[in-house]
Amino acid sequence: MGPHSMDVVVEGKRYRTAAATLLAGGPAWDERLGDEPRRLLDVRVGGLDLSAIVGDRGWERLGWQAFLFRTLKGNYFVQFQSTWPGERDRLLPLSQDEAMRLYGELPEKKLSFEEAFPGVEIEEA
C-alpha cells in the first residue's frame, strides 16, 4: 500500500502529496485495538502456530498506514490511510519535532534522517 494522492488546505496552507517528498511510511497502529497488535495475529489451530502464513503485513489490515511527507517549503505532514470500513484518509500538518518523532516510529524509511530533516543538527549521545 502506498500513499494516495491528496490535496488539502489546512489553515491557509495547501498540502499536496503529489508535490511533496515522501520521507517514511508504514503501519500506524489503531489505538482501538489495544497496545499489543501482534497478539491479534497470534493464529493457532490445534496448537499449530499459523502466524507465519498471515505474516507481518497481515496486521496492516487492522489499523492505519501512515506516510510522512515534507513540502517544497520545508513543512511536514502525515497522511493516514484507514483500513477500517467507513473511515476516510486524513492529512495532518506536523511540527518538525512531531515529524522527527513519527519518522523514528515508521519502519520504511525512504530518505536518511539527514536528508529528511536538512539543517537539523545531530549531536553525539
Give the predicted meaning of each segment.
Residues M1-A125:
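Secondary-structure transition motif
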